């Protein structure tokens, strides 16, 4: 089975162009399933799999405390894997027939109000090169709605500041062009002129925009650590994740009259239904404003 999994992962890289993080997620999910099957029965041929094996695996995952979201992801990964095997002639039947994906409550994105955004964007120590970098990253995230992976993957050639935009490669290797406002442009230019040259190291000749203190490109994990420090410094009590500024970017655009299709394009969503979740957020926020300020609310 491990050889078949490797073939599948290679297919996802070459034919589907999926990101390294997505490939790792598939790999973890499939090996988790195989480790379960190794205990229940020796699995050398996928054609011996039955629906009962999948049902048993789902029950096992729940017993181990896996969330409905995780179980749903396992099922999606297995479904894709088995479809690949059947299409490739390595599997004659689909054991996923009549397997339902666990229902999961869809939580609304956590969004900052404008005051909290201002606190977050002004909480970096801009007297240091690292502080200038951190401020620039926060400004870019809120100004563009980039995913964190897209942010840390930015190269110098992706910046077109004289024209007021940046370009990025998002999910599915889709390129998109995103406008950059004056404030974010000014902060980014200051970082590029005053801080980035001090962070560069001769032995690392890379062109990533955002560098760590070793002169290497910043990682997602590195950014998460930075964000936790900034969030603590800001004094904001709400939980803040790497996606918080992206959620706030989308919600504030819609609140100020942007149309849904434009926001979808800026976020890089393949399906507009993904973007529509933010309309629910704006409705709830309007309801809160009404309750707070209407004399008869």
From Swiss-Prot:
It holds the Pfam family Phage_int_SAM_1. It is found in: Cytoplasm. Residues 1-86 form the Core-binding (CB) domain. The keyword Lipid metabolism does not apply. The keyword NADP does not apply. The active site is at 147, 171, 243, 246, 269, 278 (o-(3'-phospho-dna)-tyrosine intermediate). One of its GO terms (biological process) is DNA recombination. Residues 107-291 form the Tyr recombinase domain. One of its GO terms (molecular function) is DNA binding. GO terms for cellular component: cytoplasm; Holliday junction resolvase complex. SUPFAM superfamilies: DNA breaking-rejoining enzymes. Signal peptide: none annotated. Keywords: Cell cycle, Cell division, Chromosome partition, Cytoplasm, DNA integration, DNA recombination, DNA-binding. Belongs to the 'phage' integrase family. XerD subfamily. PANTHER family: PHAGE INTEGRASE-RELATED, TYROSINE RECOMBINASE XERC. Site-specific tyrosine recombinase, which acts by catalyzing the cutting and rejoining of the recombining DNA molecules. The XerC-XerD complex is essential to convert dimers of the bacterial chromosome into monomers to permit their segregation at cell division. It also contributes to the segregational stability of plasmids. Forms a cyclic heterotetrameric complex composed of two molecules of XerC and two molecules of XerD. This is Tyrosine recombinase XerD.
């Amino acid at each position: 089975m491990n050889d078949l999994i490797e073939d599948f992962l290679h297919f996802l890289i070459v034919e589907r162009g999926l990101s390294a993080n997505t490939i790792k997620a598939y790999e973890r999910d499939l090996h988790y399933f195989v480790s379960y099957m190794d205990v229940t029965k020796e699995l050398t041929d996928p054609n011996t799999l039955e629906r009962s094996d999948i049902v048993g695996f789902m029950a096992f995952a729940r017993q181990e405390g896996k969330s409905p979201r995780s179980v749903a992801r396992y099922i999606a990964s297995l479904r894709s894997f088995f479809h690949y095997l059947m299409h490739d002639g390595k599997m004659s039947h689909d054991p996923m027939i009549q397997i339902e994906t666990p229902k999961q409550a869809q939580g609304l994105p956590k969004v900052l109000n404008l005051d909290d955004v201002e606190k977050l964007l002004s909480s970096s120590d801009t007297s240091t090169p690292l502080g200038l970098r951190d401020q620039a990253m926060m400004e870019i995230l809120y100004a563009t709605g980039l995913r964190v992976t897209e942010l840390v993957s930015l190269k110098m050639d992706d910046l077109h500041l004289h024209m007021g935009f940046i370009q990025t490669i998002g999910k599915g290797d889709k390129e998109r062009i995103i406008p950059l406002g004056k404030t974010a442009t000014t902060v980014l230019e200051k970082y590029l002129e005053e801080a980035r040259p001090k962070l560069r190291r001769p032995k690392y000749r890379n062109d990533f925009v955002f560098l760590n203190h070793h002169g290497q490109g910043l990682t997602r994990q590195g950014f998460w650590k930075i964000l936790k420090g900034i969030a603590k410094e800001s004094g904001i009590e709400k939980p803040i994740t790497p996606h918080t500024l992206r959620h706030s970017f989308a919600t504030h655009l819609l609140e100020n009259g942007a149309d849904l299709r434009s926001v979808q394009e800026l976020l890089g969503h393949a399906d507009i239904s993904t973007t529509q979740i933010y309309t629910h957020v704006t409705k709830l926020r309007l309801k809160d404003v009404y309750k707070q300020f209407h004399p008869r609310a």
